[in-house]
Amino acid sequence: MEKTVLLILQSHRKDTAVSVQKVLTAWGCLIKTRLGIHDGVLDNCSESGLIILELVGDKEKHNEMARKLDLIDGVTTELVTLSI
């Protein structure tokens, strides 16, 4: 069994959120699970955040989605494949 996970780190969430969401929406059929993590609550939201995606489908498309996200200033990605 093999699982592919895309880690997305945003350093300026308020500036990057809309652009990141557009990419994720465009590639939505590849996303099986999405988890967003950031520090803060209510009016004290943090400027950085982590999104963890479990991906399905073609690896070339995974790489392309990661590349498009990496083009956004303040966003860094890491594509991880785990197998057992």
List PLM regions with ranges.
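Long, contiguous binding/interaction regions
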Residues: 1-84
